[in-house]
């Protein structure tokens, strides 16, 4: 019996030694480099970042749905789907579809509130590849497409000081971008292009004039740059400068101090 214990102990020692040697060999084969910030000069051949003359992104956002979560991450996303995020439409007055401003011309509720919810809901649908949620998302997205006007404007007409406010549209543009990443639906590009062409017709002193839309003007610029990068049309750069000049006229300290 004593000899058996000796052999077992020896076998465990040899196994442990081999494991340590393997780990040491694996760690010595690789190197770790610490940098202040990522290299922005290398070209990513898989995903597009910002096009010049925009400053390259430190990290390129992956298209929504390109990563399929597993394990505890997926479990938490499923809890969101089965909880308030996935069922908010059943209890929220803002998501009531009858007379909703995103589904009905002249609707009386659901301006910025709808895209606030839809941005997270739709991304969750794409990531989980949930057919029911994707169908619900598509219902709202089709409502957005149906709201397009001949001059390029889309969505609810919420007038302040005699002009159309752009706050709710800024948020819905994010929803459309996520939808495009998932579906490659060309209607998104057409809608956004025509919408920003309409913005170019708005006099500078009337663009982003209201406090809230001016506060969110940077959100508008992000959507412009998202559209500019794959196509490189000078028009997008011009509208970006136009929006930036109007948005940056209000000190961020005044907004958030």
What are these model-derived regions, one by one?
Residues 27-257:
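Glycan-recognition and catalytic cores of secretory/periplasmic carbohydrate-active enzymes
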Residues 1-11:
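Bacterial N-terminal signal peptides that target proteins for export
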Residues 9-20:
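Bacterial N-terminal signal peptides
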């Amino acid at each position: 019996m004593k000899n058996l214990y000796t052999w077992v102990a020896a076998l465990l020692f040899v196994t442990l030694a081999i494991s340590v040697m393997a780990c040491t060999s694996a760690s010595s084969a690789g190197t770790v480099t610490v940098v202040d910030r990522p290299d922005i000069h290398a070209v990513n051949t898989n995903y597009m970042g910002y096009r010049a003359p925009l400053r390259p992104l430190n990290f390129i956002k992956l298209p929504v749905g390109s990563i399929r979560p597993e394990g505890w991450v997926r479990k938490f996303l499923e809890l969101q789907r089965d909880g308030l995020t996935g069922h908010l439409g059943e209890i929220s007055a803002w998501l009531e579809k009858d007379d909703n401003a995103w589904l009905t011309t002249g609707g009386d509720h659901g301006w910025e509130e709808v895209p606030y919810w839809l941005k997270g809901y739709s991304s969750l649908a794409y990531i989980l590849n949930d057919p029911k949620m994707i169908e619900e998302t598509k219902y709202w997205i089709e409502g957005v497409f149906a709201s397009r006007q001949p001059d390029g404007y889309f969505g609810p007409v919420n007038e302040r000081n005699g002009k159309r406010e752009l706050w709710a549209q800024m948020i819905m543009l994010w929803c459309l971008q996520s939808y495009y990443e998932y579906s490659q639906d060309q209607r998104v590009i057409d809608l956004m292009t025509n919408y920003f062409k309409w913005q170019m017709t708005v006099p500078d002193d009337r663009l982003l004039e209201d406090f809230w839309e001016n506060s969110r003007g940077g959100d508008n610029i992000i959507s412009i740059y998202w559209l500019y990068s794959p196509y490189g049309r000078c028009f997008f750069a011009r509208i970006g400068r136009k929006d930036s000049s109007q948005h940056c006229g209000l000190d961020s300290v005044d907004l958030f101090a």
